[in-house]
Amino acid sequence: MSAIFAQEWQLDLNEAQEKAQNENKIIVLVFSGSDWCAPCIKLEKEIWNSEEFRAYAKNNFVMVRADFPRKKEHKLTPEQQQKNNQLAEKYNLQGYFPLVIVMDKNLTILGKTGYKKLTPTGYIEHLNSFIN
């Protein structure tokens, strides 16, 4: 199974917002360099792909990925690349990778973080600390 399908990811923030509003969930927007950014890859492997995080996220978060791969074989469609570029212009001007942004269903930013050497439970608590 490909890592991209291990976690249910939205690729469009507007669709994610609609889902968050309908399901009363928090949005977690992740800027990633999936094939070149070592901390992004660790975050994917250690947190996003963990059973524990996936189970929690399914009920509490709408996960959105804005990926910026560099290898030709991982190249995004021009439309997706444009969407990701627009998200970066709005939410990640400094170009931090990974950048994890926690938002409410109205796209109000509640907090920002990145890779942390935490267990999945610890990372869930870390993300929730922005919400409460």
Sequence positions of predicted segments:
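Bacterial Sec-dependent N-terminal signal peptides
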Residues: M1-E8
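Thiol-based oxidoreductase modules, predominantly thioredoxin-like and allied folds used
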Residues: W9-Q10, F53-Q82
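Solvent-exposed loop/turn segments at secondary-structure junctions
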Residues: S34-C37, I47, F68-K72, G95, ...
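Non-catalytic, surface beta->alpha helical segment in thiol-disulfide oxidoreductase systems
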Residues: E89-K90, Q94-N132
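Typically the conserved alpha-helix immediately C-terminal to a functionally engaged Cys/Sec
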Residues: C40-Y56
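Short active-site neighborhood of thiol/selenol oxidoreductases, capturing the structured segment around
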Residues: E23-C37
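A short beta-strand-turn-helix
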Residues: W9-I27, A57
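C-type cytochrome heme c attachment motif
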Residues: D35-K42, P98-I101
